[in-house]
């Protein structure tokens, strides 16, 4: 699937802060294909996702030993660790170097510092998951002006890139909403308040998930409350979820790994197994919460595929190939108690 990404650059002056780290160890995570409400749409998306996963293993040999940087939103979430693992494996196969230069927390100024450090270090290309698409755009524009190639993984900024590899987040959010709605109706619950916890109001990937989730409840008697933000911190998410539970919500949706963990822990602490918790992303903690019945399910992405294909895309464009801003959906699947590994 190819289309042009045309963005307006937003100029920003940012303070240089500490916290950018490099060369961290990785975890392991793989997932399958998108599940949507329509069987026909599901089959099409699964086909595209399998194609993406299959092609991710085809190494692209570099003409030179290029230096690449991988900059994610933080260096802690298992999602980013797994994305880095995929990137490192493909870098070895392609004959290039990838430095994992990500902040220790989800912080725009620290991510800007990472971009500036990568540029100063003489990298040929940058793979980035933008924490704040507006905030990071000025630094990315400056990097492009110096001839550095940009590829987006997971979450784009507002600067035109060579290619983007990410989940169809709105579709994934809508699937999450559909799963919650079905579970509530199975309990005989057809109305009530539903909470949403997400990382922040600016990250496009999580904003799209929230939008899709809300869409799933349109026309129903459920009321989806105003989103609360935790900056990706599981402890903050748990406090927010506990407040939601005190107010009598029937379900809570988490837009990322930290939010999802916090929701599961809050439901566990409440002792109320009727509250339906649904999340996004996959980690060992999230899987345990699903197995133990504190979360219904999570939308599991393919971060390893994002990392592998991101490296290949940078190598291809540095070798001279035009990618024309292609956008590739790397897929998402519903992980629940029945299919969890």
Name the predicted role of every residue range:
Residues 7, 17-41:
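Bacterial lipoprotein signal-peptidase II cleavage site
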Residues 54-64, 193, 197-201, 205, ...:
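Hinge/cleft segment of the Venus flytrap/periplasmic-binding protein
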Residues 61-63, 111, 165-191, 235-238, ...:
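Hydrophobic alpha-helical segments within soluble ligand-binding/sensing domains
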Residues 91-103, 193-198, 214-234:
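Short beta-strand elements in bilobed, periplasmic/extracellular small-molecule ligand-binding domains
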Residues 116-145, 213, 230-289:
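Hydrophobic alpha-helical
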């Amino acid at each position: 699937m190819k289309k042009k990404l045309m963005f307006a650059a937003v100029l920003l002056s940012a303070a240089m802060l500490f916290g950018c780290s490099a060369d961290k160890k990785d975890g392991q995570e793989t997932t399958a294909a998108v599940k949507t409400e329509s069987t026909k749409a599901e089959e099409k998306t699964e086909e595209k996702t399998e194609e993406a996963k299959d092609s991710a293993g085809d190494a692209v040999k570099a003409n030179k030993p290029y230096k690449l940087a991988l900059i994610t939103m933080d260096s802690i979430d298992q999602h980013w660790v797994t994305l880095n693992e995929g990137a490192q494996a493909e870098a070895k196969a392609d004959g290039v170097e990838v430095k994992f230069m990500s902040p220790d927390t989800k912080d725009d100024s620290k991510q800007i510092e990472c971009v500036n450090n990568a540029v100063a270090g003489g990298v040929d290309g940058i793979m980035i998951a933008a924490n704040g698409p507006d905030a990071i755009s000025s630094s990315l524009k400056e990097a492009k002006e110096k001839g550095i190639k940009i590829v987006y993984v997971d979450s784009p900024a507002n600067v035109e890139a060579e290619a983007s590899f990410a989940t169809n987040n709105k579709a994934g959010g809508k699937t999450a909403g559909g799963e919650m709605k079905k579970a509530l109706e199975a309990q005989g619950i057809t109305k009530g308040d539903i909470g949403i916890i997400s990382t922040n109001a600016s990250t496009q990937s999580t904003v799209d998930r929230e939008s899709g989730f809300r869409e799933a409840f349109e026309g129903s008697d459920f009321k989806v409350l105003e989103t609360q933000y935790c900056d990706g911190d599981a402890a903050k998410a748990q406090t927010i979820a506990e407040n939601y539970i005190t107010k009598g919500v029937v379900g809570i949706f988490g837009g990322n790994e930290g939010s999802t963990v916090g929701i599961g822990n809050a439901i566990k602490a409440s002792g109320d197994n009727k509250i339906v918790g649904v999340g996004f992303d996959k980690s060992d903690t999230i899987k345990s919460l699903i197995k133990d019945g504190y979360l219904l399910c999570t939308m599991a992405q393919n971060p390893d595929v994002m990392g592998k294909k991101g490296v290949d895309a940078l190598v291809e464009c540095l070798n001279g190939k035009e990618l024309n801003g292609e956008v590739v959906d790397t897929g998402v699947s519903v992980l629940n108690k029945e299919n969890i590994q």
